[in-house]
């Protein structure tokens, strides 16, 4: 999908593939870069090195965490703030409740009148009025009198106890009480829930429905929140047909764009799309100009002749990570273009899904207050079969749960998206684990939200 704002990013397919060279002067202390156009082919092509060195997943994550961009803020109505990240701390300026109130339906009385009440010598009090929520009873409560009170109604002056209806015996306009009651019983005090001056929500909190209720109760109707991270999606490939189009000839239909857009929205990002961009350096570079915090490129991340994106990023910005020790998604790239954090995800759909969850999604989730953890419910279960891996590589294995045991979904290829559809979730085999044995307990990340 292409947003209206992205119409200026379109680029015709018929351009000659040529690489515009840039010289990069990078200030490593501020992580900013200045670029001067040279108009010539780069002397060093990062693709020619292949993947001689692959970073560990931990190294890639550390690089991302050091480059998380900052977000601007905006003020929005309280009722629209669910799941948004609070930009500043909020302190209550009022007591909640702001008055003494009855916490039960019953009778407001003076505890001193009941001091000697017993079964053999009950105390009889005359009911002299009623008090309802929002309507205070202005006259002080006299000794040996009672006032019928509803839950939440203000306590009458001098009343310091509420006796529930079920604890008294009614006789016309009188109540009979056969036991003493401690002062303050069933009476809510000012500031009992929130005292004036209390820090109620800290900056950086992801706002929940109960938070909205509390903020409303202290008189707040709008909040300052972090803007949603703007994420621009660039899908490359001359072989791609638009999403939802039946495949034909030697073309394939774009599966990654709609999948990534859904993932970005799930993690709280605001997504725009350049649509399908041809494998042309100028077209890709033009798509990079979107005013966003994060750019995600699907396809063109490896070292093939048409994989221009790593070289473009190396020349025009900073290619911090290219190649990660994991399967699938090993051709992942991560870098900086001007102020934008850029993720290069493989074109194979399962690699794309895995690379998003581990890397791009992590950055978006941290920016939206969801935390860095994978956004899936976890379950510990035994393996129903062995799983082969190699030490030094992290593996992402799609699995099914059958009769309480975990087995692989086959085939496991990086292009086999149906394997993820048929899977209940996935298992991550750590770099240290190597192969896993039948019966070994593993954590399954279920393909369902936490």
Predicted regions and their residues:
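Short, low-complexity N-terminal leaders and the immediately following helix N-cap/first helix
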Residues: 22-25, 32-119, 370-396
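Short, glycine/charged-enriched hinge/interface segments at domain edges or termini
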Residues: 39-58, 107-275, 406, 410, ...
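Flexible glycine/proline-rich
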Residues: 61, 74-83, 88, 134, ...
């Amino acid at each position: 999908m292409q947003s209206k704002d992205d119409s200026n990013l379109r680029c015709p397919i018929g351009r000659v593939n040529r690489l515009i060279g840039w010289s990069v002067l990078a200030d490593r202390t501020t992580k900013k870069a200045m670029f001067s156009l040279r108009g010539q082919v780069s002397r060093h092509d990062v693709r020619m090195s292949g993947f001689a060195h692959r970073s560990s997943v931990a190294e890639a994550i550390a690089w991302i965490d050091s480059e998380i961009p900052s977000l601007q803020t905006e003020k929005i109505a309280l009722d629209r703030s669910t799941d948004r990240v609070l930009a500043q701390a909020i302190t209550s300026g009022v007591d909640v409740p702001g008055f003494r109130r009855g916490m039960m339906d019953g009778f407001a009385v003076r505890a001193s009148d009941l001091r000697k009440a017993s079964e053999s010598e009950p105390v009889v009090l005359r009911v002299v009025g009623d008090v309802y929520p929002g309507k205070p009873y202005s006259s002080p409560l006299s000794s040996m009198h009672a006032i019928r009170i509803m839950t939440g109604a203000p306590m009458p002056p001098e009343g310091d106890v509420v006796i529930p209806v079920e604890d008294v015996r009614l006789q016309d306009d009188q109540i009979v009480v056969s036991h003493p009651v401690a002062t303050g019983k069933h009476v809510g005090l000012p500031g009992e829930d929130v005292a004036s001056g209390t820090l109620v929500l800290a900056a950086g909190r992801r706002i929940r429905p109960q938070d909205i209720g509390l903020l409303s109760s202290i008189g707040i109707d709008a909040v300052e929140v972090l803007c949603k991270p703007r994420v621009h999606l660039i899908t490359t490939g001359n072989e791609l047909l638009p999403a939802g189009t039946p495949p034909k000839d030697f073309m394939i239909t774009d599966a990654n764009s709609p999948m990534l857009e859904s993932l970005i929205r799930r993690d709280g990002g605001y997504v725009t799309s350049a649509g399908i961009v041809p494998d042309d350096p100028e077209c890709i570079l033009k798509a990079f100009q979107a005013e966003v915090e994060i750019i995600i490129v699907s396809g063109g991340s490896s070292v093939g002749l048409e994989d221009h994106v790593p070289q473009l990023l190396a020349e025009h910005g900073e290619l911090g990570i290219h190649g990660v020790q994991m399967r699938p998604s090993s051709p992942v790239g991560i870098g900086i273009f001007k102020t934008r954090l850029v993720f290069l995800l493989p074109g194979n759909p399962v690699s794309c899904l895995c690379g998003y969850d581990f890397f791009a999604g992590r950055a978006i989730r941290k920016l939206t207050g969801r935390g860095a953890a994978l956004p899936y419910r976890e379950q510990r279960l035994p393996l129903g079969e062995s799983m082969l891996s190699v030490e030094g590589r992290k593996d992402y294995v799609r699995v099914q749960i059958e009769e309480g045991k975990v087995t692989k979904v086959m085939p496991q290829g990086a292009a086999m998206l149906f394997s993820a559809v048929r899977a209940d979730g996935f298992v991550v085999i750590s770099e240290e684990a190597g192969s896993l044995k039948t019966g070994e307990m593993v954590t399954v990340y279920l393909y369902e939200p936490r």
